[in-house]
Amino acid sequence: MSGLPQGRPTFGAAQNVSAVVAYDLSAHMLDVVAQAAEARQLKNITTRQGYAESLPFADNAFDIVISRYSAHHWHDVGAALREVNRILKPGGRLIVMDVMSPGHPVRDIWLQTVEALRDTSHVRNYASGEWLTLINEANLIVDNLITDKLPLEFSSWVARMRTPEALVDAIRIYQQSASTEVRTYFALQNDGFFTSDIIMVDAHKAA
């Protein structure tokens, strides 16, 4: 199973496995994936709409679940991860990629604010320690955790989410008022460019 956005994990997985289910809350996003799959002649992709916290699949149904930059939209990450555990086969893998909270309160509130202004469906980015706790509490076993920095060019970053102009202006005003600590940590530039922390966690369900 592949969690979106924009189908990238879906298309990559479809070239290596017999069947992929692209799952998302957004009907529009699923339509985009279905059309792109047809254009690429990928016939092993199906789509399903729903919430991460209530997956409409049988127990032990999937070999792998991939979520790429979607978990920060989930309203209850713990519940979603417990659902992932339920639908994974014994020994099945979970791969989660997302923007990561820096953990430090001042930096965290800055990141959450610009994320929410850019996309009002944003709920929260989590720190690495929070991810480890949530995955452990879902009875999944972490095999690997990688963090990195993601450079973000401002114009394309807001364009991807079709952020309304008023909120784009609000982000720029908020950026311009950032403290020296925030500017340094996020490598914030005068043109709006900045970097975000990202995380990838590879975990599995006990066999």
Curated annotation (Swiss-Prot):
Pfam families in alphabetical order: Methyltransf_11
InterPro entries: Methyltransf_11, Methyltransf_Superfamily, SAM-dependent_MTases_sf
GO-annotated molecular function: methyltransferase activity; S-adenosylmethionine-dependent methyltransferase activity
Gene3D superfamilies attached to this UniProt entry: Vaccinia Virus protein VP39 (3.40.50.150)
Top-rank lineage group of the source organism: Bacteria
Family, as annotated: Belongs to the methyltransferase superfamily.
Name listed for the protein in its UniProt record: Uncharacterized protein YafE
Organism: Escherichia coli (strain K12)
